[in-house]
Amino acid sequence: MSTINIESLDQDTKDEPKEQTQEDNNEVLKVLEEKINMMDPKNTSGDTEVVITNFLKSKKEVKWYVALLVIRVFAFVFCLIAFSVLGASEQRVLVSENLTNWYSSGFTIQTPYEFHWYKWDEFRYSFAANVIGFVYSGLQICHLVMYLITKKHTINPKLQGYFNVAIDQTLAYILMSASSSAATAAHLLKDYWLEHGADTFIEMANASVSMSFLAFGAFALASLVSGIILCRFT
């Protein structure tokens, strides 16, 4: 009889910690529920689902805004390199020319030629387009950084979305047009002036055109991402 009592006592002592932990967990859950109800007494299961949905939506929205920020940084850098290289493209070459007149058999003179980007309308067009894209991208980067920090829009997000899509598409078309015209001018210069020693100017012009085309691609991609943000999150 004593052994049975001892075994039952041992089993009771083993079960007591389990029951105690369950009671503690139940008390913790009750306290949490009371705190939630105190914070929002009208909270229901439907409201909780809405909150969770909005939270997941905001996380996706932040990811798209981060992607847009990265694209705008690339556009900013490409435009900066494009107009910086084009603005520095200057060269002076000496071209040998043979002259013949009635009193001599002919002689050779060296005529200096100076190459400056602002002497061609195509290069001026490309320079202006990249400067505009550079300034616009810088302003957009500042705005996106401010939004990611504060999570607040400075203006109506729908209105801003329409503005972003319109300006991104416009600048993409302008950069494509400017890059194409500058590439044509550089190709025409290469056909004649490359053999006369103007290779440095032509190479810098081609490098600027390449960066301008990359800036066009960045703005086209930014327009696409801005449209996705406008359609899905505003």
Curated annotation (Swiss-Prot):
The keyword Transmembrane applies. It is a multi-pass membrane protein. Induction: During Rhizobium meliloti-mediated root nodulation. It is found in: Cell membrane. GO terms for cellular component: plasma membrane. Residues 87-128, 190-210 are extracellular. It comes from the Eukaryota. It holds the Pfam family CASP_dom. Residues 11-21 have a biased composition (Basic and acidic residues). Residues 1-65, 150-169, 232-234 are cytoplasmic. Keywords: Cell membrane, Glycoprotein, Membrane, Transmembrane, Transmembrane helix. Glycans are attached at N98, N206. InterPro entries: CASP_dom. Residues 1-24 are annotated as: Disordered. The keyword Transmembrane applies. The chain crosses the membrane at residues 66-86, 129-149, 170-189, 211-231. Belongs to the Casparian strip membrane proteins (CASP) family. Homodimer and heterodimers. This is CASP-like protein N24. It comes from Medicago truncatula (Barrel medic).
